[in-house]
UniProtKB/Swiss-Prot annotation:
InterPro entries to which the protein is assigned, alphabetical: PyrdxlP-dep_Trfase, PyrdxlP-dep_Trfase_major, PyrdxlP-dep_Trfase_small, Ser_HO-MeTrfase, Ser_HO-MeTrfase-like, Ser_HO-MeTrfase_PLP_BS, SHMT-like_dom
Major localization class: cytoplasm
Gene3D superfamilies referenced in this protein's UniProt entry, alphabetically: Aspartate Aminotransferase, domain 1 (3.90.1150.10), Type I PLP-dependent aspartate aminotransferase-like (Major domain) (3.40.640.10)
Highest taxon in the source lineage: Bacteria
A Gene Ontology biological process term: tetrahydrofolate interconversion
Keyword Transferase: yes
Amino-acid biosynthesis as UniProt keyword: yes
Species per Swiss-Prot/TrEMBL record: Mycoplasma mycoides subsp. mycoides SC (strain CCUG 32753 / NCTC 10114 / PG1)
Biological role: Catalyzes the reversible interconversion of serine and glycine with tetrahydrofolate (THF) serving as the one-carbon carrier. This reaction serves as the major source of one-carbon groups required for the biosynthesis of purines, thymidylate, methionine, and other important biomolecules. Also exhibits THF-independent aldolase activity toward beta-hydroxyamino acids, producing glycine and aldehydes, via a retro-aldol mechanism.
Protein name in UniProt: Serine hydroxymethyltransferase
Pfam families: SHMT (PF00464)
Quaternary assembly: Homodimer.
GO molecular function: glycine hydroxymethyltransferase activity; pyridoxal phosphate binding
Length: 413
């Protein structure tokens, strides 16, 4: 059996390692996992098929797989104060798919946040499975504040009387009032589901309210702010446990990815530490430091700022460029972010009026407020003066910052 990585793959792998080491990563959904998580992702656990759940497998030889998955389930329950946890979903999208299947029948009505306001594809986007399987209606944000308007959400819910309300977003920078969502859901007898994929790490660290107190089902990814192996996680009340488990297997998936489940479990254990709590606090501090610099230099922030790990910047109104153009300018100097639609966007989704900036990855590398102030000034300088000479100068500043906070130094391929 071949024991060496193909040179066709190895070259790209080493280039990607170098890119991660030498760039400032500001994509809000990305992070740097620990060396332990990396090792588990590539462990012998990838060889094992384990359809079913601990103690109830359809394959033999699952004794040690059961030990790891059971530890992951218990850790997730304790970390988020959940009655039940399923750590098998391959992704956040599949976690959402299973949650819908547990609560709904096809064509049932759902109210969720619109994509342009900050929602996610799996919250009813027409060409996504959610949009053509269920009957979605949407709420957005207030046009003046660009924040959730709970009175307006209540009006929409009372009008459409959904079976399920989805709270949570992929590009919303303010605290979400889960208690208010629960009160609205109760007025029409609807279930409440929270997608906390972006904020799970902040919830674990205690710097964002925990939706488990109010929601019937909570879904999340295990990467992003949770800093784990890529995948999904479902947390719920005990009364929904059987339906959720059946919706995951055999409803949505076959064999679970046990190497990734081990990586998820490791990340959940890491997230249970005091060190991780400090990490979550630092994310919020860093986001506010970055936001302040951008605002002080004339950039307009959607919703007026941020309470969490991300910032949405309106580059169209302040700099007269699209999000796509801003993304390319920043990438040219080694700062990675993504173009993003903003509320009431007049640009097409491939161009957008905004960019989304996140602090989790560089906080993992050790950046604190001072470094993020420097990053903010570099961003402003690059977007206001994208001349070749200026961008070359700024690229050197990016390289210098990355060299001061190295990552994955001992990894060789």
């Amino acid at each position: 059996m071949n024991t060496k990585i193909s040179p066709l793959i190895k070259e790209s792998l080493n280039k990607e390692l170098k890119r991660q080491q030498s760039h400032i990563e500001l994509i809000a959904s990305e992070n740097y996992v620990s060396k332990a998580v990396l090792e588990l992702n590539g462990s012998v656990l990838t060889n094992k098929y384990a359809e079913g759940y601990p103690g109830k497998r359809y394959y033999g030889g699952c004794e040690f797989i059961d030990e790891i998955e059971s530890l992951g389930i218990q850790t997730a329950k304790e970390l988020f104060h959940a009655e039940h946890a399923n750590i098998q979903p391959h992704s956040g999208s599949q976690a959402n798919d299973a949650a819908y299947k547990a609560l709904l029948e096809p064509k049932d009505r759902v109210v969720a946040m619109s994509l342009d306001a900050g929602g996610h594809l799996t919250h009813g986007y027409p060409i996504n499975f959610s949009g053509y399987t269920y009957d979605f209606r949407f709420y957005g944000v207030n046009k003046d504040t660009e924040q959730l308007d709970y009175q307006e959400i209540e009006k929409i819910v009372l009008e459409h009387k959904p079976k399920l309300i989805v709270a949570g977003a992929s590009a919303y920078s303010r605290i979400i009032d889960f208690k208010k969502f629960k009160e609205i859901a109760d007025k029409v007898g609807a279930y409440l589901m929270v997608d906390m994929a972006h904020i799970a790490g902040l919830v674990a660290a205690g710097v964002h309210p925990n939706p488990l107190e109010y929601a019937d089902i909570v879904t999340t990814t295990t990467h992003k702010t949770l800093r784990g192996a890529r995948g999904g996680l479902i947390l719920c009340k005990q009364e929904f446990a059987k339906k959720v488990d059946l919706a995951v297997f055999p409803g949505s998936q076959g064999g679970p990815l046990e190497n990734l489940i081990a990586g998820k479990t490791q990340a959940l254990l890491e997230a249970s530490t005091d060190e991780f709590k400090e990490y979550g606090k630092q994310i919020v501090k860093n986001t506010k430091a970055l936001a302040n610099v951008l605002q002080e230099n004339g950039l307009r922030l959607v919703a007026g700022g941020s309470d969490n790990h991300l910032i949405n910047v309106d580059v169209k109104s302040t700099l007269r460029i699209t999000g796509k153009k801003a993304e390319k300018i920043l990438e040219s100097i080694g700062i990675i972010c993504n173009k993003n639609m903003i509320p009431f966007d007049t640009e097409k989704p491939f161009y957008t009026s905004g960019i989304r900036l996140g602090t989790p990855a560089m906080t993992t590398r050790g950046f604190k407020e001072e470094e993020f102030k420097q990053v903010g000034l570099i961003i402003v300088n690059a977007l206001k003066d994208p001349s070749e000479e200026n961008l070359e100068k700024l690229a050197k500043q990016v390289t210098s910052l990355c060299e001061k906070f190295p990552i994955y130094q001992n990894i060789k391929y």
